[in-house]
Structure formats: C-alpha cells, structure tokens
C-alpha cells in the first residue's frame, strides 16, 4: 500500500546547497530538533498514520541507497504525521539492518509512536546533514542521522496543511 504523499516525497529534488529562502521557511526546513515537538508547540495533538512498515531490499530504496551502507535488507517505515488528525507531514525512514542492534532495535517497534519521540531522547543522536528538496510546490528535507554512530535516513515532505506554508 502506498499514499500519494509518499509518491511525491520520493519525487523530491534536492538543492546542492542551502537555497536563499524566507527565514521562516528555513527555520522549518533546517530545524535540528524534533518536528513532532515543533508541531506540538503549535498547540496540536500529534499522531501517526502508518502507511507501510517492514523489511525491504535495495531495489526498493533507490533514492536512499547512495547515502547508506550497502546491505541486503533495510527497515522501511512510511507514515503521515498528523496534527489534530490532519496530515501535516509525510515521512520515510530507511534503516540499514546493521543499525538494528542493541537499543536501536526499538526502531522496529515504534508502531504509532512518532520517530522524533524516540530519536530526540537519545544522547547518542547525531546528524550528518540536512538537504532541502522541492517538488510540485511542496518543500521537504532529508537527513542522515546516526544513533551510536549507526546510520539511518529520514526524508520528510511538508504537506499543504503544514504551518510551514
């Protein structure tokens, strides 16, 4: 099962450098903290609508593969992050199977818990980069994060109802 927002997320084209944009827009796109927390700061109840979750092979992650270690399997999680039930963000997380060891096994068991609630409580979280992307008038971003030095890739598409717009 897929969702149109995830199709658009996969169509994002990324800027080679951070573009010159309105400061308020950049504030959202370059946020280093949890997007879940940012949405909650808008006075909203944040929830996750699960689109897809499970192991995939390399052929199902062509956009992410150049940014991750080459492995036989990856954990894929695709969601809509909703604010008071309205989708504000589409998210796609790709986790190499080698990352899923020790405490990071919890990444497979998030269920309807927003990823940010897990990631941003970890003292071992680091971010390699944020890339800004755009497709058909919508903005997105992609980050390679590390937990205890182990990589995962998070791509987010801000949907039309999001306060980013």
Curated annotation (Swiss-Prot):
Gene encoding the protein: ubiC
Task performed by this protein: Removes the pyruvyl group from chorismate, with concomitant aromatization of the ring, to provide 4-hydroxybenzoate (4HB) for the ubiquinone pathway.
One cellular component term from this protein's GO annotations in UniProt: cytosol
Gene3D superfamilies, A to Z: Chorismate lyase-like
UniProt-listed Enzyme Commission number(s): 4.1.3.40
Keyword match rRNA-binding: no
One GO process term, biological-process aspect: pyruvate biosynthetic process
Main location (coarse class): cytoplasm
Residues involved in substrate binding: 35, 77, 115, 156
SUBUNIT field: Monomer.
Annotated protein name in UniProt: Chorismate pyruvate-lyase
Enzyme class: lyase
This protein's pathway: Cofactor biosynthesis; ubiquinone biosynthesis
Family: Belongs to the UbiC family.
Pfam family, one: Chor_lyase
Keywords, alphabetical: Cytoplasm, Lyase, Pyruvate, Ubiquinone biosynthesis
């Amino acid at each position: 099962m897929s969702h149109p927002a995830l199709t658009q997320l996969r169509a994002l084209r990324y800027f080679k450098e951070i573009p010159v944009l309105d400061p308020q827009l950049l504030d959202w796109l370059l946020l280093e903290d949890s997007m879940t927390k940012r949405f909650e700061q808008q006075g909203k109840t944040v929830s996750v609508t699960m689109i897809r979750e499970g192991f995939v092979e390399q052929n199902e992650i062509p956009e992410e593969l150049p940014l991750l270690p080459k492995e036989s399997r990856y954990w894929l999680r695709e969601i809509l992050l909703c604010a008071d039930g309205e989708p504000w963000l589409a998210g796609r997380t790709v986790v190499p199977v080698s990352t899923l060891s020790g405490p990071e096994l919890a990444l497979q068991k998030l269920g309807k818990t927003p990823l940010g609630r897990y990631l941003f409580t970890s003292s071992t979280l680091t971010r390699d980069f944020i890339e800004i992307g755009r497709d058909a008038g919508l903005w997105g971003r992609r980050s390679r994060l590390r937990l205890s030095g182990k990589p995962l890739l998070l791509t987010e598409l801000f949907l039309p109802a999001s306060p980013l717009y």
